[in-house]
């Protein structure tokens, strides 16, 4: 495990539709408890707290619209549902017109992104050590995906679904946020190379080696198959 340099690093997250069904939206509805600012080209509009803004691709006067809170409050996208809840986002929302559809990119500090990942990937009531380990794993995974840049056609680095790491499926949690803060900047490396920290929710107790599942002939030494055993004699 290594400590990354202190830099104000950000990540760009492509937000999918309800049920993570599609990468592009028919319309986008945004609101916030506090005032927020909408910028389209040279024009700028201020929306009051509680006001809902509805944007459709056909109505967009610019190819890109950016939305940010005037008071660093979270932005809710009411046109998206995650389970029974409406997700809320830190940072900036960037809406990009693509024909009759809209792409939504949430740009925010990477550490704050992890606040939205941890409780979506691991129950926040798990032990502190487990949450800290997951925070390091999630940070390393995000950094690796930024390097891979597989979503460059969307001008994003990850999306919010299981294709990457689930993000904002569950609300932020104080315990999970603390685990992120306690491990700030820590990533997993193999030698001087950032490691690929794949993880999964369900296991039968046996993992397999990387060359069997990652569609590559290159063996990754630290991703070797293991039998996971637990002593339950006590």
What annotation goes with each model-predicted range?
Residues 1-234:
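Conserved, single-site charged/polar hotspot
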């Amino acid at each position: 495990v290594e400590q990354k340099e202190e830099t104000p690093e950000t990540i760009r997250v492509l937000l999918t539709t309800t049920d993570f069904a599609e990468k592009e939206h028919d319309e986008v509805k945004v609101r916030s408890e506090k005032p927020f600012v909408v910028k389209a080209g040279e024009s700028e509009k201020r929306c009051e707290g509680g006001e809902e803004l509805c944007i459709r691709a056909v109505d967009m006067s610019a190819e890109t619209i950016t939305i940010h809170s005037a008071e660093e409050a979270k932005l809710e996208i009411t046109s998206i549902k995650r389970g029974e809840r409406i997700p809320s986002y830190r940072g900036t929302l960037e809406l990009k017109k693509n024909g009759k559809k809209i792409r939504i990119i949430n740009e925010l500090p990477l550490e704050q992104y992890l606040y939205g990942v941890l409780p979506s990937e691991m129950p926040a009531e798990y032990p502190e050590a487990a949450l800290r380990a997951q925070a390091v794993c999630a940070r390393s995974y995000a950094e690796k995906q930024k390097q891979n840049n597989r979503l460059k056609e969307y001008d994003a680095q990850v999306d919010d679904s299981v294709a990457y790491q689930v993000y904002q499926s569950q609300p932020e949690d104080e315990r999970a946020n603390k685990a992120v803060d306690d491990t700030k900047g820590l990533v997993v490396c193999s030698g001087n190379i950032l490691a690929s920290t794949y993880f999964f929710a369900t296991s039968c107790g046996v993992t397999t080696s990387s060359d069997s599942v990652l569609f590559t002939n290159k063996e990754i030494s630290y991703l070797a198959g293991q039998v996971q055993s637990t002593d339950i004699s006590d």
